[in-house]
Amino acid sequence: MTLPIHTVLPELLATLRAQPNAVLVAPPGAGKTTAIAPALLQEPWCEGEILLLSPRRLAARAAAERMAELAGEPVGRTIGYATRMDSRRSAATRITVMTEGIFRARIMAEPDLPDVSAVLFDEVHERSLDSDFGLALALDAQGALRPELRLLAMSATLDGARFARLLDAPVIESAGAAYPLELRHVGRGDGRLEDEVARVVRQALREAEGDVLVFLPGVAEIERTAERLAGLEVELHKLHGSVPSVEQRAALRRSARRKVVLATSIAETSLTIDGVRVVVDSGLARRPRYDVGAGLTRLVTQRASQAAVTQRAGRAGRQGPGVTYRLWEAAATAGLPPFDPPEILDTDLAALVLDCAIWGAREPATLRWLDPPPVAAVQAARTQLQQLRALDEEGGPTGHGRALAALPLPPRLAHMLVEASDRARAAQVAMLLSERGLGGNDVDLEARLRRWASERGERAEAARRAAARWAKLAGEGGERQEVGALLALAFPDRVSRRRGDGADWLSAGGRGFRLDPAEPLARSDWLAVGEVQGQAAGARILSAAALTTAEVEQLFGAEISSERRVDFDRASGRVRVEHLRRLGAITLSRSQGDAREEELAAALLDAVRTHGLELLEGSDGAQAVRARAAYAGLDLSDERLLADLERWLAPALAGRRTLPPVTAEMLLALLDWPERQRLDTLAPAEFVSPAGTRHDIDYAAEGGPRVELRVQALFGLDRHPRVGDVPLVLSLTSPAGRPIQTTRDLSAFWRGSWAEVAKEMRGRYPKHHWPDQPWEAAANLSTKRRQGLG
């Protein structure tokens, strides 16, 4: 069969004879995945093995099986494959289709790639971390060790110019697919996604011929859509990473009945699903988003990129004329992002930083990247690796770090495996954390481990074999360890203690996690938490195992700190003296204690510095002093009081656990002698009346300094009293203290409205003397009889 890719093969072969690198852009269905590698085998420069890198296990296995079928050979002879869980190769194998992660491990182990003639990076537009890193390592190896090594970047929707600059290579473009493809934009209503998708699937089954491939963002949407399609006269398949391989193969094979395959992005690239002529595309994808500060990943559902929807549509036209139904309007396609964001910009970089250090690139940016790893993420990864003892202070790999890198696991899980005594069980826990759905989807890893032990499917068996290999690599140990203890080795910062009913948990690293209180694990006091997902505040626990308090004490004895804390408790208003035992942010125990006088005083002063003067209860006298100072132009502001706490507040704290009320005397102690003289001169505290009575002057009153007193106390005074040049505001009251007049001009009051006031007062208070000319009368607060007038 002649494929579109065959028209550009001569150009590609000629290019790779003349130079080591090339970039190939070929639309879906052109045949690049299965046609290029066999063609390169015949080239004179190709004396060794060809490595064809695939982004997914399913695609790697399917590509190898298809090429072997075309060659008329069984898989594992000339053409084989290698994935994390499975491998079919032999001494005769010339083409190995492998996942990008397997290639990364291989080139790290053998940087010169002995007996390898070419590395083909397929579907590089997906920009996975392993693909970008593998290409950077291959370019470095080519430049330093293997100048004759051929490197080919291939994709259907490639940003060709950028790859061409990186590889210093020409871009070769293939013609379109062999079959016509119709795009039907049907839009999406207001219903739930699965209802809308099910509606369009039924429409497609009526209008078009052939099997139907449906793209959905995740497993949950696949399950709900399957429920809505139940009862259709079709063969219904689910295709995602957790589906056992036997079921994956069934989804790929042609069936006697019409077939509907519900898939995630696993089916976007490098796969031919026999019989598919129709694609239904939701237009959505679910991507991980990494929070560097929190060290957590959350899944975000977002619009798929133009590159992704092009790949999806191409699935319909691989074996004949096809049609793609899109659940959006045609005009919206231009608004989709051109490509998926590179994974390197939004993921945990611990494994990459460790591998770079071992490679000799302590600064990853020194390698050749399409997009260099973000500086903040590199630093966070370096910190994590130093905590795991994988890197030294200079960023170089330690012996322990090299041992971790030798295992096909992320550094945390590799650390667990190396540090465990029960390495067989540790390898099994690592497998459960690596393979979603293995042993079920329980949060409790103990339950999943038991269920996996009884599973007999192909995936379960392959996982057991892989875990056994990991344990052997680490050097199998003996003494049994519980799952929680093992998990705590990998994620010590996620060891968590229950708060309340089990819905909320506090981790040693200070993060708060959430767990469904109906989960059996919610009854545990402690959890070793593995996977978490969501926002930094309140991320959801996906996998965990129970821990006992005794296990926590045993595992983290060296990390548990003892602390004596003397601090101010704002709720009670008292200084607390506590003895604390802590594991990170978790308080294990607390007890009350005693403190020295200077410690109590220091805690009270610190509380006022932290929370401000609002902690202090102010007396009327203290407020009056501050008002006088402000009137006199002296500084008793909050800023000065806070700056000089030791001078005016500290002396009053001796032996106290609570803050005292602020008195006038405390504030006056802050003023030096010239300031006190200025205060008394410009803002005297009292007004002494002609009757000899003393009255506080209110300097905070509206309108200026004010004095309230009985009008009789001012008899005999014809000149208005002043503070400096400012007349006092006199609030005059009756013998009963009721207000009768406010004045700033006493003389005018006496000669004006006093006559009416006196008339009223004589009626109300006949026992008191109310003279017609009060400025000539003697001031006296007594009744007429006591004055000898009655």
Regions found by a protein language model. Name each.
Residues 1-416, 702:
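P-loop NTPase motor module signature
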Residues 19, 322, 423-428, 482, ...:
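Active-site lining segments that contact anionic ligands and/or coordinate catalytic metals
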Residues 28, 498-527, 532, 689, ...:
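Segments forming glycine/polar-rich beta-alpha architectures that bind adenosine-containing cofactors
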Residues 77-83, 486, 503, 696:
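Long, charged, glycine-rich C-terminal linkers/tails
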Residues 110-125, 135, 282-286, 295, ...:
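Extended active-site and interfacial segments that coordinate phosphate-rich ligands
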Residues 172-174, 503-508, 567-568, 683-690:
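Short acidic-hydrophobic surface loop/beta-edge motif
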Residues 235-238, 247, 280, 288, ...:
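Second RecA-like catalytic domain
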Residues 574-790:
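Charged, non-catalytic accessory extensions
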